[in-house]
Amino acid sequence: MMKKIIFSIGIITLISKLTGFLRDLALSYYFGASEITDAYLIATSIPGTIFNLVGMGLISAYIPICSHLREKKGDKASFFFTSKLLNFLFIICTVIFFLVFFFTEQIIHIFASGFQGEVLKLTIIYTKVAIFIIYFNIMISIFSGLLQIYNKFFLVAALGIPSNIIYILGSYIAYKYNNIYLPITAVIVSIFGVIFLLQPLKKIKYKYSLKFDSKDKLLKRMMYLSIPGMIGGSLEQINYLVDRTIASRVVIGGISILNYASRLNLAVVGLLISPVITVLFPKLASCIALKKNNELKEYIETSIGYILMVSLPITFMALIFSKEIVTIVFGRGEFKDIDLTARALSFYTIAFLPIAVRELIVRVFYSFKDTVTPVINSGFGIIVNIILNLLLSKYIGLSGIALATSLSLIITSFTLIITLEKKYKSFSFKEVSIIFIKVFISTLIMTIVILYLKKYIRTLSFLSILMLSIIGLIIYSITLFFMKIKFLDDFILNKIKSMKGTK
């Protein structure tokens, strides 16, 4: 039963991500990378970013506390606590609302210091509309958490699908009639999100209460528990803010170009790399819980080996076909900045491997109940990213921001591995470096073959890229087989034995 639920939610999430990608395609098709898209992206990010600095830590602590309260005191107590939290967050939202509404220009300069003239005027108008989102997004976050406690996963997972369809329609209406409909659509989507969740909330018999107690012990406890999440979330938002404000100074449409390139990058990470980590992580957590250090050491090395095997060939193929990928995905309608987006994508793809490794190692630290080390590592990464952003954007423009992000991820991933090795002496990553060399050689051979064959193809269509990729992956797999990687050989041997056993 649980496997069916997980599979169903996985399918819904995949469809949601695909419709989200279509939403980005619609925006690029109708408005390209322009002052309008820059203004829209900044205006809609301001409410979320400011709230994330304050409220996301509270929301992350909500589910365990509310779940515990429901088990101990029943549904009414959990509903009442949810209402008190909502009322508390509404107060925070109202303060944020008035600050943004009356100091719009000053706040925009924090988010996009390079905005001037028409783009600034447009962003001010958009922001005054988009700020209303904050109230509805709070409700969506809390209600989604409450429904998850009551095992109502499907509608929460499916919310993104109709929301993205509304965004696509909104982009068309804004293009056809007036671009002010872009931020208006964002507000409509947030209102729709709340309405969408009302039906499952009725099924669990949730009733909203206006009562609020600032001295509530559980609220105070939740605030205390939310501090690590708040710090981590704040660091992430600062990193995001720095990238965008520097991009706003480099070129008109720069924020949009980086947004489109990073969306492509995140799509690959989400569809191909994150599932690998999701599959590997439960076994890691089990080894840590049972204190099987030798088994854990071996499994971490194996997990990183699998990540290397998946990430490196994807990285090199994305580098080879970056321009073709951008052309196929975005190269239509009003979108003209193919070269700039392709260069940004090339630099972002360098981070495929460090993103995956870092995500895995962070989860290892969390399993050891160590939340401090990843937060310190994130803080260090932000400092590195800011320094590299300022330096590289001067010399290579917009691409420098993408490169700075990737380099900071490489550095933080490497330092996190070293920290893990020092903290837990039984760990050694010498085996991983040997695997890396073998996978890198296999990937290099694959790359040479693809580049050689690419010379003989005049126009690269989707079909020709697919064929070259398949040929490249076959070469890569054969080469990798002859590299004699222990865990891979063991895996193949076990599969052969199990196949013989079923006959």
Model-identified regions with their sequence ranges:
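Helix-loop junctions and terminal segments of transmembrane helices
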Residues: M56-K72, I273-K292, K297-I304, V362
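Membrane-interface junctions at transmembrane-helix termini in multi-pass inner-membrane proteins
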Residues: Y135-A158, I350-F380, L391, Y395
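Interfacial transmembrane-helix starts/ends
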Residues: K3-I6, L41, D75-I91, V95, ...
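Interhelical loop/hinge segments that connect adjacent transmembrane helices in multipass membrane
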Residues: M2, L198-S234, K291-N294, K422-I437
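Interfacial segments at transmembrane-helix termini and the short loops linking adjacent helices
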Residues: Q106-V129, L319-A351
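Membrane-interface helix-loop junctions in multi-pass transport and translocation proteins
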Residues: F154, I161-I195, V372, G379-F414, ...
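Transmembrane helical elements of multi-pass membrane transporters/channels
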Residues: I5-S28, G32, V189, G193, ...
